[in-house]
Curated annotation (Swiss-Prot):
InterPro entries: Ig-like_dom, Ig-like_dom_sf, Ig-like_fold, Ig_sub, Ig_V-set, IgV_Light_Chain. This is Ig kappa chain V-V region L6. Disulfide bonds join 43-108. Residues 55-69 are annotated as: Framework-2. Residues 1-20 form the signal peptide. Keywords: Adaptive immunity, Disulfide bond, Immunity, Immunoglobulin, Signal. Residues 77-108 are annotated as: Framework-3. Residues 21-43 are annotated as: Framework-1. It comes from Mus musculus (Mouse). The lineage of its organism: Eukaryota, Metazoa, Chordata, Craniata, Vertebrata. Residues 70-76 are annotated as: Complementarity-determining-2. It comes from the Eukaryota. The keyword Cell division does not apply. Residues 109-115 are annotated as: Complementarity-determining-3.
Amino acid sequence: MRTPAQFLGILLLWFPGIKCDIKMTQSPSSMYASLGERVTITCKASQDINSYLSWFQQKPGKSPKTLIYRANRLVDGVPSRFSGSGSGQDYSLTISSLEYEDMGIYYCLQYDEFP
């Protein structure tokens, strides 16, 4: 009979490309900006995430809204003032000319690896 530790060892052999947990660091943590200003938010992954990154906007009392997927692809209906860029570990979201309706919480999500 195999012990759980031996079983885990077998499972890991089946997934040779398995990665460690990926830590995402977003900056700045908060910011103030004026209307019409260019704003950039960055997100850094602890390892290469192969551009599997989305950016979301959330307003108080509302569900998150996807703005960008695959690092730089704009979701249909999202204004063109939003853009995403980056590769490997470093990514950014830029709002070219800030509008009042852009006020909210922004965050990134990697989906190269799930917990």
